């Protein structure tokens, strides 16, 4: 019976307590008994109670953290934009207060005169000319706000009065009376008159051009402006490339990185190149180049301009070319002549890639075909330095399959390499009619892949000179037959 047992235990405890109080038992035993009773009377925490209290503490901490994060996010989303909106509206009101517009008749009169007059100049320090987006108003500094405030705040083209005819005639007489080709004076005048001036070619559509004959053509790739002059004392042809306009876009951004190469044909060893102008379709070069040539030889020479789009990671794209001949019909030497020429689109078939000279020799008894790569000339420049690192690769082909291939050594930094290297293939007489040779002039690139400058073929399946050269080799066995071959684009 649990109740009788508890009562019995309770009586025993009372008896022991009385004995301890009377001193009938030892003091140490009584102290142990008292401590034991005190421990039994003290409440004990159970394990489930401890786990519940810890869980409550963790949940409380997480709740406080989430509450703090929600307060921070709400402050960022609500308070900060509201404050910025208030500041922006205040500044906008302040900016709109000083705007003063003239009468309607005055505005209409000014708008009608915008396309007839050049613009009013502003200080150099207070403006930044944009060649790519002419419709955006110019940004001024605080020092130039008084002079250019109207041009900044009102998106309308303001022009300056045109110079009088008397001034133009005086300037023309001064230029014609001076036989010297003063480049610095031309550049200084262009800088003074070009600041803040609206360029008409940026605003005109390609179907509407001025009276200078600059009409767009379906195959034209813009126009090139240059100046020609002949120096009789030094016997030099002076060429100044001024600018190009309306070039086609070659990059994904809608712009190009143009530069110009110049040759005085038929000499390709003397080559000049302008600087690369980044991200523009209307580059201004203003560079002068000299070509030593006798005056009597000008009639037989041709001035060749090639406009390229610079590409840092791949082959440069040819935009177009300009060829100038019959100098005496175009220019009144020794006086300077300003010319505008259309940049003509050039297909791959018309690109001059250079020429390769090699000889062919076949020994029927030994069944040995020898091709000797002699030299190349006027190769196309593939590097940014204006040169190439060419080598020649020869492949023995049969029914479209390459049987063997050989290559020459690489000549560094040249467009006119000399090889004099022989390459031998074993070809039996019964197979000589089924094979042909594919010759490729390559540009060695240390970093990327090697690029093909041009190719040519010889054999029964070749065209024109390639077939004739092969037939001549078979007609004269054991005799080297050499010819120059023009390089073509790889198809």
Curated annotation (Swiss-Prot):
Gene3D superfamilies: C2 domain (2.60.40.150)
Major localization listed first in the record, in broad terms: membrane
Needed co-factor(s): Ca(2+)
UniProt binding sites for Ca(2+) 4: 383, 389, 443, 445
Vesicular side: 1-52
All copies of domain C2, residue ranges: 220-341, 352-485
Binding-site residues for Ca(2+) 1, renumbered to this chain: 251, 257, 309-311
Region (Disordered): 91-147
A GO BP entry: positive regulation of calcium ion-dependent exocytosis
GO CC, alphabetical: dense core granule; exocytic vesicle; hippocampal mossy fiber to CA3 synapse; plasma membrane; secretory granule; synaptic vesicle membrane
CDD domains: C2B_Synaptotagmin-3-5-6-9-10
Cofactor note: Binds 3 Ca(2+) ions per subunit. The ions are bound to the C2 domains.
Residues that bind Ca(2+) 3: 311, 314, 317
This protein's record includes keyword Membrane: yes
Subcellular location: Cytoplasmic vesicle, Secretory vesicle, Synaptic vesicle membrane
Keyword tRNA-binding among record annotations: no
Modified residues (Phosphoserine): 177
Cytoplasmic domain ranges by topology: 74-491
Bilayer disposition of the protein: Single-pass membrane protein
Polar residues composition-biased segments: 91-104, 127-144
Record text on subunit structure and interactions: Homodimer; disulfide-linked via the cysteine motif. Can also form heterodimers with SYT3, SYT6, SYT7 and SYT10.
The protein's name: Synaptotagmin-9
Gene name in the database record: Syt9
